[in-house]
Amino acid sequence: MDFEKRKAATLASIRSSVTDKSPKGFLDEPIIPLLETINHHPSYFTTSSCSGRISILSQPKPKSNDSTKKKARGGSWLYITHDPADSDLVISLLFPSKSNQIDPIDQPSELVFRFEPLIIAVECKDLGSAQFLVALAISAGFRESGITSCGDGKRVIIAIRCSIRMEVPIGDTEKLMVSPEYVKFLVDIANEKMDANRKRTDGFSVALASNGFKNPDENDVDEDDNYENLAANHDSSINNGNLYPGVQKELIPLEKLSIVGEPVEKLHLWGHSACTIDESDRKEVIVFGGFGGFGRHARRNESLLLNPSCGTLKLIAVNESPSARLGHTASMVGDFMFVIGGRADPLNILNDVWRLDISTGEWSSQRCVGSEFPPRHRHAAASVGTKVYIFGGLYNDKIVSSMHILDTKDLQWKEVEQQGQWPCARHSHAMVAYGSQSFMFGGYNGENVLNDLYSFDVQSCSWKLEVISGKWPHARFSHSMFVYKHTIGIIGGCPVSQNCQELTLLDLKHRLWRSVRLEFMNKELFVRSTASILGDDLIVIGGGAACYAFGTKFSEPVKINLVQSVTMSENHLPPQPEDVSLESNKNNADLKTETSLSQPWVIQLERKYAKFGKDILKSFGWLDLERKVYSNEKGLCICFPVTENFSELFHEKQLLGKDFERSEENNLTKGLSLKDISCSAALNLLKEHGAKKLINVAFEAKKVAKSPLQRMREDITSILKQKGLPEELLDELPQKWERLGDIVVVPATSFKDPTWSSINDEVWCAVSKSLSANRLARQGRVEPNGTRDSTLEILVGDNGWVNHRENGILYSFDATKCMFSWGNLSEKLRMGNMACENEVVVDLFAGIGYFVLPFLVRAKAKLVYACEWNPHAIEALRRNVEANSVSERCIILEGDNRITAPKGVADRVNLGLIPSSEGSWVTAIQALRPEGGILHVHGNVKDSDESSWGEHVTKTLSDIARAEGRSWEVTVEHIEKVKWYAPRIRHLVADVRCR
């Protein structure tokens, strides 16, 4: 079958109502426009795709050697979404209430939390077309894209992909090894990756449009309706799909602060506090406490002074200070800053009060009287006059809803009696003072993320649930709030998504929500950060997230111009109705959650009125660009997705306004300027043309997904029945698998019964299709010899050579002969970020170039000696230094490094062997220059022995240095926690300096 026939058959199957062979059974909706764009080009068509997904996979544990054979339950998706994950839903699935718990099962299954980015397989007409599309994909950020199949008589297939995936074991169905808070961190990281994945996808769409690719026009109203490529459109209410309808296309820039004085890493914090000194001769931000900081990340008790205008960061020298903590609050009262509560460690929740004298820089502990103030952290505070108001927080597992007032004049606590519209218990919320009121937004109540807004009147000591017009902010916690003139701002928070990449502003004069989008520079995570006002600038310090398998991420200090932000939010507010009155919602709780409960509405118009209707929707910011325009009633009508604001305004049975009389069609559609009509007149125009408001059918028509394992089981069951073979063979189906390049690797225990050999061809074909694999292999154990050879068996495919790209580096190796270390990604990236421009590096265990290539390609080392004794790894290493164009700076030394390694030449030595590299520590000391250098010592260490391992490394290397005649001082400067190697066994790397 030639290319055109295969393309026609594939496109016909895509448009068919029959489910396809993907786990879902149909195309992922977010990338349908992208797939249509590719398929519309005469040289390409897509064969498989995934827009990106977050999932929790339940997979049975390996069978024990017990003689009683238990039937495998099979693996399944406990949770899967192609959108940003809902942390509350994930937690409810993993930590069900007692009433929802299921009965224990005989054989527990492992649970793995995953994120997998976009991947698209595309068949190309010829090799030239393939090379062009691969280059385009790489330029858009899909750097791991490549040609997976070509040659004489073969179809030319490429894969568009990137490697921002994550996979974290979280326990099993009997016991989870993680906490709900840690699951939230995982979800936040995955959502961040999902957002990055979608931005790359949008960028790829724009790149296609800029290079001659066009969308099919089957759903287009006119040539201007290419909604996926509207990034270049100058209509202020139209954007590239990442922004909200009716919000500005322009982005508010974040200005990174250039820090001098103390290292900027001291501001790499979260859970800290910040207050401003805004005087005529002094405009600074005081930062205290938090987690992170310079060197080893830990809870801090440093007091820092930042001058944002010049970037000067100073450490306040103090005789005494509060203990190290995070999750506390800091409030300014006159010339004093009061720090209250926080968490010193998991078992030590604080309720102490400390005061910092701004003029002298001296701390003093305050002994308070009055009502008891229970310990708490993650609470919120606001100061009005001489009093500090505290609400909520967390004490161990208890979330509190109490309100306490500290009178700083007599240091007396008072608890406020609960009455009226009292907020529910919560933590990780935010609160600010405005006049004689304090305003509180969001938080987490233990079950739900909140988006309610309360005000507290300090005179009547009463709470009020506020009702505000405009687009309500998304629910969040661990965010920040600030007050600027007559505006309250909200920034950052969890869940991390594009919704938290906007600055939400509450106009208190008009009681109206507004928002502007922020131009994030480096995936800033404003989670548990601080927001401080100095003049017209918003200073955001710190914030970040942590994942034990992937390290920590902190945000750089930035500055945002609020004059520009407020002005832009006012300019881009969608027009408000002039004479359409909306009935007030009597139920405040219903109103505040309207965004989460609203239906996905569309407006249906006859095709002949579609262009006119689209212009109205665009002009008034009512067109929802996050959803797709589609045809209805056999193409006679066009359905436009509309915003929630429009859905509230538009009522088909509402009488036409008196200011607009029914007119003839020509008068309505010709010569009419949309700039000259009001909001209500525009609504009436739509009604005149027969506009109907419908639920988005395309949005709701979702099919039940089937996992690859389900597909495989069904296909193999059918084969066994046809061949008359016993169904007990299904016990040997793989419950999990890995991917090496385009090879899918199933476990060594799969398909081991000799009976399988009689139906190999049918079985391997079915497995390959169900797993979307071009090549299929069965894992063998890594040989426990010095070369750690792989025994991978290729089941489908010609050979085991694969290409893998990560951190911009290409690794090529024969998977049947060489093992590949997936878990060292963060360490490879760390080595690549070392300053090695003028250094000579010796890698004593080079392998295929795991660390050699980062040193050469990213760290720009002057020269690297690569020692390796596995001939298969050396073959791959030679290929890799050539493929990455660094062969002239790499000397490969084959053989035992104790014999081949150079002596007295290295500024840096890498010892990347686990479980222990101690056998080559003498060689490493000998390789260093006479004046010393740095050693990166790898090892597997029991978690309870980490500190003693560091001491052992220091002492042993010191003894070796003395024995070699080196009078060096040997110190461990840092211990990097790379990953968990096994339960309670950590892969560590000690950075050791010898001088």
Curated annotation (Swiss-Prot):
Give the pathway annotation: tRNA modification; wybutosine-tRNA(Phe) biosynthesis
**Does the record bear Ribosomal protein in its keywords?**
no
Instruction: Cite the binding residues for S-adenosyl-L-methionine.
Output: 828, 896-897
Q: Does the keyword tRNA processing apply?
A: yes
The catalysed reaction is:
4-demethyl-7-[(3S)-3-amino-3-carboxypropyl]wyosine(37) in tRNA(Phe) + S-adenosyl-L-methionine = 7-[(3S)-3-amino-3-carboxypropyl]wyosine(37) in tRNA(Phe) + S-adenosyl-L-homocysteine + H(+); 4-demethylwyosine(37) in tRNA(Phe) + S-adenosyl-L-methionine = 4-demethyl-7-[(3S)-3-amino-3-carboxypropyl]wyosine(37) in tRNA(Phe) + S-methyl-5'-thioadenosine + H(+)
At the top of the EC hierarchy, this enzyme's class is: transferase
Q: Extract the CDD domains matched here.
A: AdoMet_MTases
- Record's keyword terms, sorted: Kelch repeat, Methyltransferase, Multifunctional enzyme, Repeat, S-adenosyl-L-methionine, Transferase, tRNA processing
Per the UniProt record, which EC number(s) apply here?
2.1.1.282, 2.5.1.114
Extract the GO molecular function terms from the UniProt entry. methyltransferase activity; tRNA 4-demethylwyosine alpha-amino-alpha-carboxypropyltransferase activity
Q: What top-level branch of life does the organism fall under? A: Eukaryota
InterPro entries to which the protein is assigned, alphabetical: Kelch-typ_b-propeller, MeTrfase_TRM5/TYW2, SAM-dependent_MTases_sf, TRM5-TYW2-like_MTfase, TRM5/TYW2-like_N, tRNA_yW-synthesising, tRNA_yW-synthesising-like_sf
Q: What does this protein do?
A: S-adenosyl-L-methionine-dependent transferase that acts as a component of the wybutosine biosynthesis pathway. Wybutosine is a hyper modified guanosine with a tricyclic base found at the 3'-position adjacent to the anticodon of eukaryotic phenylalanine tRNA.
Belongs to which family? In the C-terminal section; belongs to the class I-like SAM-binding methyltransferase superfamily. TRM5/TYW2 family.
Protein name per the record = tRNA wybutosine-synthesizing protein 2/3/4
